[in-house]
A protein has these predicted regions:
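Positively charged, small/polar-rich N-terminal and surface patches that mediate targeting and assembly
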Residues: 1-115
Length: 115
C-alpha cells in the first residue's frame, strides 16, 4: 500500500487551554485534531489527579510546513506563559486529503477511484 510522509504534532497542555489551542491549530492549517485526557509527571512534578482540571494531549497530522508553523506559534506565544510541551514525529499516512486542509475533501471512495 502506498503511503505518504506527514508530521504528527503532539501538544500536552492543561485542559483549560484546550479550546484556544485547538482553534489555533485549525487557523494555522490543521485539517483536524484528536484530544485525549491524561495525567502524568514531568519537570514541573506530578499533577495530582484529584485536582480540578486535567491535562490533555492534542494530536494533529499535518504537512511539514504546517507543523513548522504550529511549532513557531507555540514557541512565540505559548511556551513562556503556559505549562505545555510539544513534539513532532514522522508518520506515514494512506490518504493525505484527510490531513491536509489545503486539499479539497473528496467523497468516500474518491481516493480509491483516483488511483
Amino acid at each position: 500500500m502506498r503511503t505518504h510522509p506527514m508530521k504528527l504534532v503532539t501538544v500536552v497542555a492543561e485542559s483549560e487551554v484546550e479550546h484556544r489551542l485547538t482553534e489555533e491549530l485549525l487557523l494555522l492549517g490543521a485539517a483536524g485534531f484528536t484530544v485525549v485526557e491524561g495525567r502524568g509527571a514531568g519537570t514541573r512534578h506530578a499533577r495530582p489527579s484529584d485536582l480540578p482540571g486535567s491535562n490533555v494531549r492534542i494530536e494533529t497530522v499535518v504537512p511539514a510546513a504546517v507543523a513548522e508553523r504550529i511549532l513557531e506559534r507555540l514557541s512565540e506565544h505559548w511556551f513562556a506563559d503556559y505549562s505545555l510541551i510539544a513534539y513532532v514525529s514522522d508518520v506515514q499516512v494512506v490518504r493525505t486529503r484527510k490531513y491536509d486542509a489545503q486539499q479539497p475533501s473528496t467523497p468516500t471512495g474518491a481516493d480509491h477511484a483516483a488511483r
